[in-house]
A protein has these predicted regions:
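Extracellular and organelle-lumenal recognition/adhesion modules and their flexible linkers in secreted
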Residues: 1-303, 321, 336-348, 386, ...
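Substrate-binding cleft/loops of secretory-pathway carbohydrate-active enzymes
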Residues: 333-342, 349, 377-382, 425-457, ...
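Hydrophobic faces of well-ordered beta-strands that scaffold small-molecule active sites
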Residues: 20-26, 262-264, 322-324, 386-390, ...
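Catalytic-core region of carbohydrate-active enzymes that cleave or remodel glycosidic bonds
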Residues: 314, 409-412, 416-419, 437-442, ...
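Conserved, mostly hydrophobic/aromatic
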Residues: 24, 47, 149, 258, ...
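Active-site beta-loop-alpha junctions enriched in small/polar residues
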Residues: 27-29, 264-269, 327-329, 390-395, ...
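Alpha-helical scaffolding within the catalytic cores
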Residues: 3-11, 70-79, 245-249, 305-311, ...
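Active-site groove signature of glycoside hydrolases
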Residues: 221-222, 230, 265-268, 325-333, ...
Length: 678
């Protein structure tokens, strides 16, 4: 007799589904910001790169110095009377001699005829600085590029030839700007120009003809003299619905997801690596020159060209509600010595900073200073903020509760209309999760932010994760989640779980996949929802799953019970192997493995330095259905903790015991294949 499956509709259990269920989360990870969503083509245009970003980086990273034979030029770095004290470094070009010296008139003539003088223009006769962009600059036929630069010429006016250089080293477009005379401590002048790459077949669209993929911006100095340079910028003029400073094809990929909300800026970016790296929203608005740069927790640089104002404009353009996230007065817990709080004496000022964001979004620009700044940037009407996230993956201890409660109470008192989203740690289980939920219930936090990065098998095995959530307690925002790969099985596992989130849409109020963007060749995390390079956008299976749910929304869920065979049993491999990985430093002593039949294997001590997987010498072919691992572990420091993987560690299914992250122990079953997917 064939198996029979009976489905029964539970009419009494009808539930309303949140109208804000499906959204997106943008964090500047994997070059998502500068070099990604930010349309700026110049890398390190403010000359602020330094060793805090990467040990090998300096003020001239991404710049190439060109000094032709017969010329003399020295390129230095200054800090005297800068354009902006927030970003004090600038380039100094000291041009002592130019081979075949030119005048300003000859520089203009050279720019006018640059396209016909292709051979000589490959190597300029005068000293030059050339910016290589982010993996090269893509130039498109018919596109107009807006150029700007701050200059300070010492003693006399000096011309600067500006050229867009193609893959073959020849100019595609050129012009000349002239810096007026000043002095070493004098006034700066911002110069602007536009450069258009002409073509009879041109159309200034994101898919216009690409004529260079490894292009560059070249600044040529045709006359002797000294000139200071800062905040060099080059942006294509094409936009998505007039949204400036954003790469249009990436915005289009976001808009096509039809997100109900967008979370920003993080993630770990929010509270940073230490208080000096903490994200302060008010330092990311106003003139870009006065937005203090900082290192990025993911290993590069943040210019904050896409700051909070640009974020709100992006939300407005794609029809998503903003969900800004601010630190809970704590730095990130994923550092060697754990989180550091904002000092109590500084908490009143920090609370004012939090309240200021709400005013920036919602207050009347005629009566509020923060709203007046919004209006000065071009947006008189409010942004209609509804949600505010406080904290991210925090260690839920007494200090966190103290700082969070102060902020939470202040927001409730000043703005009862704002829905606060709290945090319950980095995983859907463990100490932070349990304590976070307990505190959220006690404090009456409206929504809590859960995170869950898991194997495909975990999602299939935990479809009931929200079935038994307390309907009278805080609602859930699954703010970061994803299945560990980009294969079809991963998209299917996410789709299955999203269906159950929709079924529980009365308590799961919001959800967003993470991370959102990743630039090929610069991935800090994998998988991601949208991959890109300088030319194209790539959408893996998970993207289409997100789009499917967001474009086929429901408002009511009817629970269904199933009677009959609903699972398929698959045997798991019983291979026994061991490895240690993770980013922390730890010593393993008295290491041993014992199987259920009494086989005892002594393993060598390991001093793990956090620099890659270390395999343990387990006898080849060892197999067991159950076994015990013993070790004395001394944990020192490092990001993300350390993990002992056991089982079929080179296959698709194994166990992982993680130590140190949040100063706790977590045991999970890892799996990327069908064996754990049933």
């Amino acid at each position: 007799m064939a198996d029979k499956l009976v489905a029964t509709l539970d009419k009494a259990g009808v539930r309303k589904i949140s109208t804000d269920l499906w959204g997106v989360f943008f964090e500047d990870i994997s070059y998502s910001g500068d070099g990604g969503l930010n349309s700026e083509l110049v890398q390190n245009g403010a000359f602020e790169y330094n060793r805090a970003d990467k040990p090998e980086w300096s003020n001239y990273t991404a710049w190439r110095k060109i000094v032709p034979a017969g010329s003399f030029a020295a390129f230095g770095v200054g800090e005297t009377a800068p354009v902006a004290e927030e970003n004090p470094h600038y380039a100094i070009a000291e041009i002592g001699k130019v081979s075949g010296e030119q005048t300003a008139d000859s520089a203009v003539s050279r720019a006018d005829s640059a396209l016909s003088q292709t051979d000589s223009a490959c190597t300029p006769a005068a000293p030059a600085l050339e910016n290589l962009g982010f993996d090269g600059m893509v130039f498109r036929a018919g596109e107009t590029y807006d150029f700007s630069i701050w200059t300070r010429a010492h003693g006399k006016a000096l011309p600067v030839q500006v050229a867009l250089i193609g893959d073959d080293g020849k100019p595609l477009a050129a012009t000349v700007v002239t810096a007026p005379a000043s002095n070493a401590c004098g006034e700066w002048t911002q110069l602007r120009a536009e450069l258009t790459i002409t073509s009879a077949q041109a159309a200034p669209q994101p898919n216009a003809e690409i004529i260079a993929t490894q292009g560059a911006l070249r600044l040529i100095f045709p006359e002797p003299g000294t000139i200071d340079l800062d905040f060099v910028s080059l942006e294509p003029r094409t936009t998505y619905k007039d949204l400036k400073h954003f790469r249009p094809d990436l915005v289009e990929a976001l808009a096509d997801l039809h997100p109900r909300f967008m979370r920003f800026p993080g993630g770990c970016i929010t509270h940073g690596l230490g208080l000096n790296n903490m994200y302060h929203w008010d330092r990311t608005i106003g003139p870009v020159e006065h937005r203090p740069h900082n290192f990025n927790v993911w290993g590069y640089h943040q210019s904050f060209r896409i700051g909070f104002y640009e974020y709100f404009r992006l939300c407005e353009t794609i029809g998503a509600k903003p969900l800004p996230v601010l630190p809970a007065g704590m730095s990130c817990q994923n550092t060697s010595q754990g989180p550091v709080p904002v000092a109590q004496e500084d908490m009143p000022a920090y609370i004012d900073e939090v309240l200021g964001l709400i005013d920036f979004c919602n207050a009347d620009s005629a009566t509020n200073k923060w709203a007046a700044k919004r209006a000065a940037m071009g947006h008189i009407e409010p942004f209609n903020l509804e949600y505010l996230g406080i904290g991210n993956e925090d260690l839920i201890d007494d200090v966190f509760k103290n700082r969070f409660q102060q902020i939470f109470d202040a927001v409730k008192a000043a703005h009862p209309e704002i829905t606060v989203v709290g945090t319950v740690g980095p995983a859907p289980s463990g100490q932070d999760y349990e304590q976070g939920w307990a505190y959220a219930r006690e404090a009456g936090i409206p929504i809590v932010d859960e995170h869950s990065y898991q194997s495909s098998s975990w999602w299939f095995h935990n479809l009931d994760h929200y079935d038994h959530t307390d309907r009278k307690g805080p609602k859930v925002y699954l703010g970061e989640y994803g299945s560990w790969d980009t294969q079809l099985i991963n998209g299917l596992s996410e789709a299955a779980f999203m269906g159950r989130m929709e079924l529980n849409g009365d308590v799961v109020h919001m959800a967003s996949y993470a991370p959102l963007f990743a630039k090929n060749g610069h991935t800090s995390w994998n998988p991601d929802l949208i991959y890109f390079d300088n030319e194209n956008v790539y959408r893996p299976y998970s993207y289409w799953v997100q789009q499917m749910y967001a474009t086929t929304t429901a408002d009511t869920a009817w629970p269904v019970s199933l009677d009959g065979p609903t699972t398929l049993r698959r045997d798991l491999p019983n291979t026994v192997s061991l490895k240690i990985d993770g980013g922390a430093h730890a010593d393993f002593a008295d290491f041993s493995l014992e199987t259920a039949d009494g086989t005892h294997i002594d393993l060598p001590d390991v001093s793990y330095q956090g620099n890659g997987p270390v395999s343990l010498p387990v006898p080849e072919g060892l197999a067991a259905d159950s076994y015990t691992i013993r070790a004395k572990v001394t944990y020192y420091e490092g990001m993300w903790g350390v993990r002992i993987a056991s089982g079929d560690v080179n296959g698709k299914n194994y166990n992982g015991t993680s130590l140190g992250r949040g100063f706790s122990v977590q045991v999970v079953r890892e799996g990327t294949g069908y064996a754990l997917g049933g």
